[in-house]
């Protein structure tokens, strides 16, 4: 008997065994609480899930802390609080996985909710063990003050952009400070409505695979993969629909601040000194570059901007130490997961980096090749659950039909270089494909020459980076290279979306140059300064720039040059003081330019677009009776995808994932179409009825564009009904398979559609009214074969 007791005691000494026991008990608390809440109360699945998980978290903290990992028995109050906050924080991530996973299995895969809850526990158990073991109850964990002291440069690099964004919110009256928003251009017309539909699915436990609220019914997984896959986006469930724009602005601001932190991490690794004060201005310059200011309204792109420094840090670690591949794999996985489009550009950049890396010998090169390929494939495989559906969906879009452009130049290369100078207005959208956002600080330009002449930096590193910036500059100005960088896709009004790669290299070169300054480098510094001033003189002759920009650049060059020379001459506290002064000067330039950039960009006043949202929603709700098998639309939208914002089963879709075949079909039915859109504009009685559009909502100050029957007015919004609207599904003749939408005349196309569907011909007929008149010996008669009028026959004959 004692022998069995001893075996049990010995077994219980194993941490994994104790974790399984505690995990089983925690799971029991979770499951029992969930089942009881669902059976006894009227709580929704997600609400019951969250309450059950919170109860399980409280139980798990004590079970893990005092039984499984057996952390110190006597702890200070501060240690307990820190440990508890850390534990809960990590478990909240697992809670998101559990809630979303349970809903996904229930609503998308149609599993029973209790079975779904049990299945997802396996995933949660693994996540919780890793977090608890590696982060929360780590035995050699440093005190908080030591962690802050070791990483204060990274923390400051986060705080400065965060403070800047907070001040911007206040001054520009963003969100709660006045209703303005950073969600401009497509972010207003596409992303906000898509986030509204995503919000509706998360809150109301809808399917994440398909939605009826976008473009007559769309593959929601495609849309999530392109626009909303970032895990941070789950915070939208904490906001109401009318405040989703605030959530999006918050996400943009958080990602900008995180970009500064990740860049600081990379630069600290680059020169093996993460506490160098000079890291801060370069990290902040990355976070507040013109690219970020101009394009941050593409909040899904910002995930790749913030993760790029960590991808490169992991890549360089892996090339130096083949055993260290985790950071590269996980960060690349994050980039591919959050936005495969921008991450494609990062992948091209990584291939160029790998090709230009010094692999020392053929054996090391072979090992590096296998390691680079293997870890990259691993990252892609981890995100394949989104990448594969996204790829299949992309092959149905207009961009799938690739037509390679000729090798041509957009313009002078000096027009590109001009965008590197201070006070350059950031581009937020532009029809000219040669525009580019390159500004990231005047000091970055000055340090190019100093970098090249620095003898402490390896020559092949210099050659690699110079080749990359020259190639990227060529790509900005070349139609074919530009097309390839953009994923074999045209730019559509947002030019050179990969210019953040140029900014990243430029800033990393600049920091490496300034971090390696000493007395021995003074001749190289002086030569680099001479080259920089020579470049400025030559640029002044070739670029049409405002004199204020030229004068300010001269002044900044002079000030920075003096500071860098002094930095190379002094040591100890004197060097720290000079570095502090230089950092403040550089930060002043960056922050001032960022403020001017946001002033130039402006903001969107949300009430101008959604000020009557409550009234429109009331009108929509007045005709809703559960799940209804018909569609509704807005007479005249203020936002392109406005029907999606209201979770209407509408027609319109403006987005990058739109099907090319559907665009062509909608064009044939008379609707307005573009390369990546089809809208309700252009609807006629036949097309409206065929698509099952039963109700139309019109704001009273708008012209009524369609022939429908007035029903009611709800809170200032008129409701119209189309009594001839068909169901969403109906039978047609087999001949419809032969219908093509390429007729030059939409009436001919519609006639052909109806005839092939029903056998009824002549839905629309040509009318040639007699037009005659005379005045001053001039006689007017209708004799123009190109002037055609079409009349609609009785649609009931359908």
Residue ranges and their predicted role:
Residues 1-3, 8, 142-174, 371, ...:
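Start-transfer (signal-anchor) and selected internal transmembrane alpha helices
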Residues 142-148, 270-272, 316-326, 355-370, ...:
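Membrane-interface junctions at the ends of membrane-embedded or membrane-associated helices
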Residues 161-263, 284-305, 394-398, 407-432, ...:
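Membrane-interface coil-to-helix junctions
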Residues 185, 190, 196-200, 231, ...:
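Periplasmic/ER-lumenal interhelical loops and adjacent helix-loop junctions
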Residues 221-226, 246-258, 278, 285-309, ...:
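Membrane-interface micro-motifs in multi-pass membrane enzymes
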Residues 238, 547, 577-798:
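Soluble catalytic regions of membrane-associated enzymes that act on cell-envelope
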Residues 253-270, 275-360, 371-396, 532-537:
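Membrane-embedded helix bundles of polyisoprenyl
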Residues 342, 463-480, 489-615:
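Contiguous transmembrane helix-bundle modules in multi-pass membrane proteins
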